[in-house]
Structures are given as structure tokens and as C-alpha cells.
Amino acid sequence: MRTVETLRIAVIGAGLLAAAPAFAFDGSKTTDAVASPVAVPLAPAPLSPTEAFRFGTQSLKNGDKVKAVHSLEYAAENGHFLAQWKLGRMYAEGEVVAHDDLKAFEYFRRIADSHADDNPDTPQARFVANAFVALGNYYLSGIANTDIKADPDRAREMFSYAASYFRDPDAQYYLARLYLDGTGAPHDPRQAARWFGLSAQKGQCQAQAMLGAMLFAGDHVPRQAARGLMWLALAKDSAPSDQQGWINNLYESAMRQATEDERALAGVYLKHWLETRKE
């Protein structure tokens, strides 16, 4: 019995030794008995709105439209207003995405709601002002088959805010048109001329053309033919292709009617304008 018991204890001891970690003769563990750690991949950290915006704009440059839109939407949903503005422009113009004025309107409205009080002297203020201008134009005409109906009074509020607070030249031009046409505002050509003037000084070609035509003809303002020709010439030289037709017509009509002295004086005014802008 003692022999059997001794054997049983020896077997159990051998089993325990086999299950225990192996040690070298110096007491250190041998490597072949140590389990290798399992590498568990970590989930990538989510992009910040700014990182997503940058990735989206870079994807646009690379031609990857799907990644671009997804990244911009992620940034926009997380409050990145430049992503909201970019998507608004894309939907308004049908660039990369299908044209959708209602989606564009919603993006622009989010910017206006959140950034109306931004400092007007910061570089990004022009994007906020542009959102107000876009909203003004949507309210002016409405969006077909949606709840956004034509509301000239609301359009004037949008243009007026961007024109006054942000001093935006496009807003000033559109506000002037409302006063000139009596749409959403009292018919007030003198007020229109004032806003055209503020916009024209900033280089807005449509305002330059309208102001030039009013001054040349003496339409509700004292006639200044040479000054009017100067503004028309500036407008003609800077007009984008989609505005060249009517601006060129105004310029050519005024040039046909102008006297030699008026043309000569307009040239003097134009030279002075260009020289002062270089300084």
C-alpha cells in the first residue's frame, strides 16, 4: 500500500510539474513556455470636423466624389460651417451632387442661424455673408414644390443684414436692386444708387454697371456722364462671361451717346481709379 501511495503521489507531482511554467536552471522562465501576446487591432480614432473637411476637399481635388461628399457631410453634421457652405454651393450648382435647392437652402440657413454674429472683419465672414445672400435669392423667387415660398420682404431682410453688418458687396448690389425695382422695399432710386455705390467701390461689376448707367443718364441722380462712363468701363473689363451681354450693351450705348470731352474725362477718371487701387 505504501508503494502504491508513493507512486500515486509521484504521478500527481509529475502532472503538476508539467502544467507549471518551465524554468531554466538559473531560475528564469524559458521562452518556449510563454504564450505570445495576441495583437488586437485598435479602431481608428474618429476624424475631427476640421480633419474631415480637409479630407473632403482633398478628395474633391483627387476626383473621389463619394469620399468627398461623405467627409464633407460628416464635417457639416458636426458643425463645421465651411463644410456646410461648400455643400450648400454644391447642391445649389449641381456640382458633384445632384442639383437640390432645398438641401442648399437648409445648409445656408444653418450657417445664418449659427454665425450671424460672427466678427465681420475675419476672413471667414465672407462665407457667412454669402450664405445670407443665397438665402435672400431663394426667398426672392421661392423654391418650387417646397414650403419655401417667394417672400420679398424676407429676401430684403437677408440682403440688408449682409449688406450692413458684413458689408458684403453682392448683398449691397441685390439690396440696391430691390430699392430700384420696389420689390420687398419702397421704390427708392436714390437709396438704390447709394447701395450701388458702396458695392461698386468694392469692385462688384454688376453694381458698377448699374451705377454707371444711372450716372450717365442722370436717372434719379445728378447727371455725371464721365463718371458714369468710368464705372461702365470698369464693369465691362471685369464682367464674368454670364454678365458680359447686358453690361457690354450698357457700355456701348453710353459710348455712342457720349461727347468727346466726356470720353476724355472718363479716361482721366479711369486712370486715377486704377492708380489708386495699385497703391
Predicted segments — roles?
Residues 31, 242-279:
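Terminal, low-structured helical/coil segments at or just beyond the last alpha-helical repeat
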Residues 47-48, 63-64, 77-81, 93-95, ...:
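Short helix-capping/linker turns of helical repeat alpha-solenoids
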Residues 19-66, 70, 78, 84:
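N-terminal leader/linker segments that initiate helical-solenoid repeat arrays
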Residues 41, 74-75, 111, 161-162, ...:
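Canonical positions in the second alpha-helix
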Residues 105-114, 222-242, 268-274:
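TPR/TPR-like (Sel1-like) alpha-helical repeat modules
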